[in-house]
Structure formats: C-alpha cells, structure tokens
C-alpha cells in the first residue's frame, strides 16, 4: 500500500465518521481484493514458483526459504495455497496500517474476494446471468497479454507511446495492371492479410472497390473493400486488414464478413500455416510456404525483421522506413504490447445495453459532478462486450463442465451446471452429478471449464458480497448510499458494478459516487511502482502522526489530484497540537463548572461569536451533505484559529472573573461561550483528526466523540447577534491593529497601550464600545478615544516604557 491508498481511504472515512455522528447506522466493511494477476505475479516472484496445472497436488510441498533463480513448477492447488498464504500475511500488515490511520471500519464485516462466500456469490451471479442470457461463451478475437498468457478486457488497456516505423508496401493488382501501395506499422501481419480497405468517399480508390490485389511474399488474392472507419488522412489512405492487428481490424473483419487467418499464438509466437490450403489460398504456395517456414515459432519482432528483409529483396518495400512515435495498446500491468488472439471466452453482453447503462450514469449523483463525463465517455467508447474470462489460476472458477462425445469432442453449447445449493464449486476438482472422476477428460465424459473470472467480475458484486446477498441485511442496505473510489477505476470497478446491479437488481448499486484524485509526487507526476516514486505511509505516520496525515488527505478536494506535501502534514500536526492545548486552556477555566446553557450567553461580543459559530455549523454540515469534506475542514479550521487566536485572548480575563468592571453575568457569558464553542469545534474536527479529538473529548465527557451528536443549531439556543452588528469582527480588527503596531515597534505583546484612538462611523464605534472591556484586557489598553468620522482610522500609542 502507498500514500495514494491513505489519501482515498481517508476521504471515505471522514464521510463515514460524519454520518455516524448524525445518527446514521453506517455499513462500513473492509474488503480485500485478493485474486487476480497482480497477486499471481507477486507469488511467483516472492516464492520463486510457477503454476503448471498438469502437475499433481503435492500436500508436502513447502517453498524454499529463498526464491531460487530458476522458478519451480508446482500444481495449481499448491500455487493457490501459496497465494492464500501470501495475501493473508499482507492483510495483517494492511489492517495494521488502517488501524494506525484511524479508519473506522467495522472489522466484523471484513471479507475477501477469494473467500468461499465470495466465490459462491460470484458463481451464483454468473449462473443467473447465464440463465437470463446476459452472458455467453464464444470463440472470438480476444485482447491477449502474451506474458501473462491470458485474455484481458478493454477496461484494462492503456496506451503507451512507443517508437515505430511506417512501411510502404506495394500490392500487385490481380489483373496485372499495376500495384496499390499501403502503409503499415505492422508488416509482420502480412501473412494474416484478408483485404485492403479505404473510405467509401475517397475518390482515389472508388474505382478499385470490388477488385483484388495479391499480397507480396505470400501471393494470397485479397479484395479491396470500402468502410467508413478507414481514415483517408492516415498513411496512404488505404489500409491492410489483418486478423488481427487491432480492434479496428476486428470491426472490419466482423462487419465485412472476412475470413480468419490468425497466426499469432498465445505465447506471442507465430503458429504453423499451410499456404495453398482453403484458409490460406495462394497462387504460389511453394514459394509462400518456403518463406513462412522461416517465420514459424518466432516472436513478433523477429518476424517483423524477416518480413521487412523479404519485402526489400522482392522490391515490394517502397522507399525508406518512416520513423514515428505512436500509441500502442498494453495490458495495464503488462510489459509487451497486446496481441489479438482467437480463443473461447465468456462475455457479458454490454454493447446492446449501452443506452440503459448511459442512463444509469445520469441517475447516479457524482461528486464531483464532472466525473460523470468519464463514465459517459467510457460507455460510449465501448467496442466489444465485457470479456470476463482469464486463463489464470488464482481466481473464482467458472461453475461449469462440458460433456464430451464418443470422439472426445467438447460440446461447449451444452454446459453442465451445478445447483445453487452446491456453490462454490471448482470444476477442476469437483465432479458434476451423473459422472465420476474417472470420466474427466475422457470420451463420453466431461471436462471442467479451465478458466477463472476476471477480478472485476467478482469485485462488481461487492455490494452482494459485503451485504450477504439474499439475507435480511442485504434487503436493508441495498442500494447503498455511497461508493468511494479513485477516478482511474471508474471504467472498471464502478462501471462493472453498475452493469451487474442493472442486470441483477434493475437499479443502481449506490446513490452517490465519491471520486478521489491521484496523489502526485513533488514534481506533480502520478505515483507509480514502475517509476519508483511511490511513498509508503507508515514512516509519515511515525513522523507526523495519523491526524496530520489525515489532515493532508482531507485537504484534497474530491476528484482533484493532490501532490504529497509534508509541509501540509506539519500544518495538520500543528492543528492537532493546538486542539490539545486550546482544550486544556479552556477547560482549565471551566474546572468545577457544570456544562453551561446557551441562555447564559448575554454579552454582545459573545452573542456575535456564537452567531458566527452557527454559520460554521451550517456551512460544514452543508459541505458534508454534498460530500465536500475539504470545504467542511477548511471552514472549520479557519474558525478554530480565530477562536484560539482572537476570541480566547479577548475573553480569558473575563472568564476568570478578573479585570475592571467584572460582573458575574459577564463571566458566566464568557465561560458558556468558551464551553459551547469548544464542544462544537471538537465535534466538527472529529472526522478529520479523530485521535486528538477523542483524547480531549474524554477530558470532560463520557463516551466517544465519534458517536456524539453532530452539532446542530438547536444546541446553540436562541442566541442572536447583538443589536450593534459585527461586534466580534470589529473588535478583532482593532485588536489586530494593536498587535501589528507592537510587532512593528518590536515590543512584547504584553506591553501596554497608552492610548487607543479610533475614528469611524457611529455604528462601528457602538460595536467597539460593546467589546471595549475585552479589548482593553486583551490589548493592554489604558485609555480609549472614540471619535465619529466617515472612515475608519486606528491610532495606537504605546506606553513610553514599552518603546
């Protein structure tokens, strides 16, 4: 875990703490997203192992203490056991971090996405979608990571800028009348070419539509076709369609009903091919096969080099290569560019529900509102159904077996499904009803589905998993109120959860989405393990304290990227320490005094101050109710400092019952204002700095501040501002002038003022008269001179001894 997790988890926690204080029963679970490719890769590297599903389970296996240089092959069950072992150890560390941070999770609601409970929920959801026709199995072009050797979904892609070259290649016309030149960055796909394509309105190629050309090196006759996705401005304006270079190739292949000549295997190497066959017709099969024999089994880069050399020698490569830098699709956790491989996968039918899913996005309340456009853009840009199959090991298995006929051929169209009461099941070890283990992988027997679900296929059901789908609890909490998350997983976690809830419950899964930004490094670059600029949180907690770290996190507004800033953490630490000291100071003046009533607040300056406090309560509450926690903190913190720096200094003499003109009513008014304000501020700050507020709250209250009622105007009574409005603000302005003059003269703030002369409008002077005694005590003023004038003027004359 890094500082970015602390950032977003703090945002969720301050909301949970606020809601709890308003009297809500807060459902706040902790889920561990254990399964998936990152966990497998970590286990492989940590233990020095790799999974080989063909190996038998070894119950005595124990990984070496130090990971060997050469990875050890182990069975799937042994591998999964190591995944559980490592994730459980990680969770202990993670849990310790969240507790140190003060995240107020209900640990009785803890769950894991790989637990038996989560697997049963995931498998039930899959079976019910299958029954409703919302999920289907198909052999189709699939986005494929050749290192992980698994399918990935559109949501898991990212573009990375990579160098490349445009290759201008000549295709001879089939009628011998000349040639057509195309430009491509992937000449290695030439043996997979099935057509050329241009825009239907491109005058350069209109006369060629319906004619054929011959592929260089392989002599395969392919048509020239028209399609609106062809870009007249890109390359030569006419493109090569191959099976498959990118998702546009897939679209052309599907919409133009083209043949399949897929040659890249799951390991990223070129598969065998027989030119002259029905799949690879060639007018010069011997030559084509002779050339292709040198490509079979090679990597993409190796084949590219061989093809370019062959094109050069044949004269089909026109001119020099044109260097470019262009975006290349990668799996977000992968190291090599994605390929498109034909394979059998399970898909969720999302494309035909696009409009309904867009409508769901409009129904959802987004915080901040502009984040809805990211969801909308994602849904509008979908070009394939959601692939939920992964060819990996540590995940939720698909609950399906398939019968085999007398020849051992698998019938994928007639899956054998378990009863819901049998879930969770693992088809690689469990046996379907009516069969015995001896019939596994045999003719007239069965095979288990070998794949596991995409991690988002499980995480998309977090409301059902955490809420115990089908129970009274689930009926009570669904749909949930809030989904807090980061913006980069809108297209994955949020979208997939909306999809599943739309299908399963015909509703949104939650009413609000609170979206956090990224944490940036000091150079304002996104933190990334691969870049090496990740900051871990525990050293920061040890240095500055959890309250300080939370303060920094809560200062980042929803949806806004925020740089890590230890200076901001120091401010948070100062706030926590000041809360401690101010509480100690105020409570020292209230010792032995019962909690006062607002009715005791009678002095004009006190009434004005409480009126300002009421405004802060209103503003902080309104901000929290719109999930703008940063605004609530900003407003509360600003008022806290004016309370400490100004109000406490103004009234502390009166609160002691000391000074000239001291009265019992004046003392009582000051003490009541101090006590009520301290109580309110401690509660307003509690969601942000929970440790120090809990400490000071228990000094004078029973129970926890975190279940104390959130401040409301009713507890401030009927206190209204004084007749002379803005007494407190005007007195503070004068006090600041006194302090400024003392600082300018480089004398102690304790030094006295011989004369404080104030010229100003009558209303302002009336306000100052109402606070004259407090101002005299706080500023050390011996004498006042108040004169009416149109504008305010303050003259401070320090005592001679002070100069």
Q: Where would I find each of the regions flagged by the language model?
A:
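Short Cys/His-rich metal-coordination motifs, predominantly Zn2+-binding knuckles/fingers
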Residues: 148, 218, 334-336, 404-406, ...
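Active-site-adjacent bridging/hinge elements
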Residues: 14, 64-70, 95-102, 219-231, ...
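Structured ligand/cofactor/substrate-binding pocket environments in proteins
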Residues: 4-16, 32-33, 118-121, 179-310, ...
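Feature 926 captures the class I aminoacyl-tRNA synthetase adenylation module centered on the KMSKS loop
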Residues: 168, 384-457, 461, 503-546, ...
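Short, polar/flexible loop-turn hinges at active-site or ligand-entry regions and domain interfaces
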Residues: 49-55, 76-81, 296, 538, ...
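Short hydrophobic alpha-helical segments that form membrane-spanning helices or hydrophobic packing faces
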Residues: 139-141, 193-195, 341-343, 402, ...
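N-terminal, positively charged nucleic-acid-binding surface of large information/translation enzymes
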Residues: 1-201, 225, 242-278, 311-357, ...
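Charged, glycine/proline-rich intrinsically disordered loops and linkers
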Residues: 48-77, 278-295, 413-440
């Amino acid at each position: 875990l890094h500082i970015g997790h602390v950032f977003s988890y703090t945002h969720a926690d301050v909301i949970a703490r606020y809601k709890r204080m308003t009297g809500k029963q807060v459902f706040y679970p902790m889920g561990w997203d254990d399964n998936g490719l990152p966990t497998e890769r970590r286990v492989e590297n940590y233990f020095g192992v790799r999974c080989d599903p063909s190996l038998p389970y070894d119950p005595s296996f124990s990984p070496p203490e130090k990971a060997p240089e050469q990875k050890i092959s182990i069975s799937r069950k042994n591998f999964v056991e190591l995944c559980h072992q490592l994730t459980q150890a990680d969770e202990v560390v993670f849990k310790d971090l969240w507790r140190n941070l003060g995240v107020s999770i209900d640990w009785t609601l803890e769950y894991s996405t790989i637990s038996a409970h989560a697997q049963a929920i995931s498998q039930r959801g899959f079976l019910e979608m299958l029954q409703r026709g919302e999920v289907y199995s198909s052999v189709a072009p699939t986005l494929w990571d050749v290192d992980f050797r698994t399918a990935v979904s559109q949501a898991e892609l990212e573009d990375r800028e990579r160098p490349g070259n445009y290759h201008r290649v000549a295709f001879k016309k089939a009628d011998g009348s000349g040639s057509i030149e195309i430009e491509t960055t992937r000449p290695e796909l030439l043996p997979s070419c099935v057509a050329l394509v241009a825009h239907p309105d491109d005058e350069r190629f209109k006369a060629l539509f319906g004619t054929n050309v011959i592929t260089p090196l392989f002599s395969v006759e392919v048509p020239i076709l028209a399609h609106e996705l062809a870009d007249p401005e890109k390359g030569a304006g006419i493109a090569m369609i191959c099976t498959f270079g990118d998702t546009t190739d897939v679209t052309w292949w599907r919409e133009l009903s083209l043949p399949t000549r897929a040659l890249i295997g799951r390991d990223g190497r070129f598969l065998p091919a027989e030119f002259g066959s029905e799949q690879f017709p060639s007018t010069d099969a011997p030559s084509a096969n002779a050339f292709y024999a040198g490509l079979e089994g090679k990597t993409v880069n190796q084949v590219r080099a061989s093809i370019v050399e062959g094109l050069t020698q044949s004269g089909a490569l026109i001119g020099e290569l044109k260097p470019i830098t262009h975006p290349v699709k990668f799996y977000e956790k992968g190291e090599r560019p994605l390929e498109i491989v034909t394979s059998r996968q399970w898909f969720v039918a999302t494309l035909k529900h696009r409009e309904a899913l867009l409508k769901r996005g409009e129904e959802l309340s987004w915080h901040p509102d502009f984040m809805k456009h990211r969801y909308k853009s994602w849904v509008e840009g979908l070009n394939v159904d959601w692939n939920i199959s992964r060819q990996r090991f540590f995940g939720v298995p698909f609950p399906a077996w398939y019968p085999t006929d007398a020849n051992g051929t698998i019938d994928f169209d007639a899956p054998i499904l378990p009863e819901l009461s049998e879930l969770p099941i693992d088809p690689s070890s469990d046996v379907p009803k009516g069969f015995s283990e001896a019939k596994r992988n045999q003719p007239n027997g069965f095979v288990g589905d070998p794949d596991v679900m995409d991690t988002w296929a499980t995480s998309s059901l977090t409301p059902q998993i955490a809420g115990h789908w089908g129970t009274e609890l689930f009926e009570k909490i669904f749909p949930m109120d809030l989904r807090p998350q980061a913006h980069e997983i809108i297209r994955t976690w949020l979208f997939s959860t909306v999809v599943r809830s739309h299908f399963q419950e015909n509703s949104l899964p939650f009413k609000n989405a609170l979206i956090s930004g990224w944490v940036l490094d000091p150079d304002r670059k996104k933190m990334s393990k691969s870049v090496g600029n990740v900051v871990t949180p525990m050293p920061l907690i040890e240095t500055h304290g959890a309250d300080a770290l939370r303060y920094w996190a809560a200062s980042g507004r929803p949806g806004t990227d925020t740089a890590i800033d230890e200076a901001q953490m120091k401010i948070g630490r100062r706030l926590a320490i000041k809360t401690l000291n101010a509480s100690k100071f105020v409570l020292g003046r209230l010792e032995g005094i019962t909690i006062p009533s607002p009715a005791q607040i009678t002095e004009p300056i006190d009434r004005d101050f409480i009126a300002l406090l009421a405004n802060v309560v209103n503003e902080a509450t309104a901000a929290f109710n719109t999930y703008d926690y940063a605004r609530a903190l900003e407003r509360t913190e600003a008022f806290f400092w004016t309370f400490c720096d100004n109000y406490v200094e103004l009234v502390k003499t009166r609160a002691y019952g000391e000074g000239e003109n001291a009265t019992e009513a004046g003392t009582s008014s000051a003490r009541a204002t101090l006590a009520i304000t301290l109580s309110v501020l401690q509660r307003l700050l509690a969601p942000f700095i929970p440790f120090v507020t809990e400490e000071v709250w228990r000094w004078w209250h029973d129970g926890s501040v975190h279940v104390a009622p959130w401040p409301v105007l009713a507890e401030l009574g009927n206190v209204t501002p004084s007749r002379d409005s803005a007494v407190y603000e005007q007195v503070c302005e004068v006090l600041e002038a006194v302090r400024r003059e003392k600082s300018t003269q480089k004398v102690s703030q304790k030094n006295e003022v011989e004369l404080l002369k104030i010229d100003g409008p009558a209303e302002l002077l009336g306000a100052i008269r109402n606070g004259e005694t407090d101002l005299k005590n706080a500023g050390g003023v011996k004498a006042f001179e108040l004169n009416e004038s149109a504008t305010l003027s303050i003259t401070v004359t320090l005592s001679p001894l002070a100069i």
